[in-house]
């Protein structure tokens, strides 16, 4: 189990829908009875209440609201089960071989499973292709409903770790206390995934240690390309006689 870290995939599909022009941040997201009945962390959405997609994203990223995550899943997918099918399909595309999603918010459910490696894969996809997520997950406090609802970020590393850029925390009885933490310093970007901690203090300490190790032991560097490096390679029995090479 990975608790609310699940919401990274929910967010990834949402931002992909935004990029494709299928939805916009100003769209109104309706609240169903199903979303209303979500337990755990929430912003106490009422059936029929209408918030913009932008507001729902704030609730998900800052306060880890389960009701908002399910409302968005229903808005994007038509229903939560259909959206979860898309989550699993996307996980397969990304090579997340040990992941199965059963819901869009991360509440404990039989068969809802993943690994630290798979969480890192989807976190990387989110951060690389949709860096605008940082505009949401690095906000410490915000409000909704004209100031009536206060949002406080569940990621305490925002207040204590230099270069932190996100990403998502999670806590349930079966999953324990979890985090997928991301940070950037001097063009080096790292992701640290901690699952199954016994407390928030342990979770943040473990993530801090992992990130500290990464920044101490690695650096970003450009590899020089030799002037005589081949530009193409010959292809035998292929549709094209040569294959162009590029350095990335």
Question: Where are the regions that the model predicts?
Answer:
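Domain-terminus/edge residues, biased toward the C-terminal soluble/receptor-binding domains
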Residues: 96-100, 108-113, 117-248
């Amino acid at each position: 189990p990975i608790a609310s870290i699940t919401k990274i995939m929910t967010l990834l599909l949402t931002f992909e829908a935004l990029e494709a022009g299928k939805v916009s941040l100003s769209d109104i997201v309706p609240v169903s009875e199903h979303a209303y009945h979500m337990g755990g962390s929430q912003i106490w959405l009422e059936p029929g209440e209408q918030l913009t997609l932008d507001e729902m994203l704030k609730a998900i990223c800052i306060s880890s609201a389960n009701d908002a995550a399910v409302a968005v899943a229903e808005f994007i997918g038509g229903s939560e089960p259909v959206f979860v099918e898309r989550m699993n399909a996307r996980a397969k595309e990304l090579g997340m071989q040990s992941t199965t999603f059963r819901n869009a918010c991360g509440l404990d459910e039989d068969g809802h499973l993943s690994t630290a490696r798979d969480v890192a894969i989807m976190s990387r996809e989110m951060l690389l292709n949709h860096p605008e997520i940082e505009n949401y997950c690095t906000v410490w406090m915000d409000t909704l409903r004209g100031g009536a609802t206060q949002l406080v970020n569940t990621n305490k590393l925002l207040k204590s770790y230099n270069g932190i850029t996100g990403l998502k925390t999670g806590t349930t009885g079966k999953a324990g206390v979890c985090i997928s933490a991301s940070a950037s310093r001097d063009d080096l970007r790292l992701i640290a995934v901690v699952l199954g901690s016994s407390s928030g203090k342990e979770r943040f300490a473990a993530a801090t240690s992992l990130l500290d190790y990464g920044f101490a032991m690695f650096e970003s560097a450009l590899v020089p390309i030799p002037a005589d490096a081949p530009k193409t390679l010959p292809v035998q029995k292929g549709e094209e006689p040569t294959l162009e090479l590029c350095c990335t």
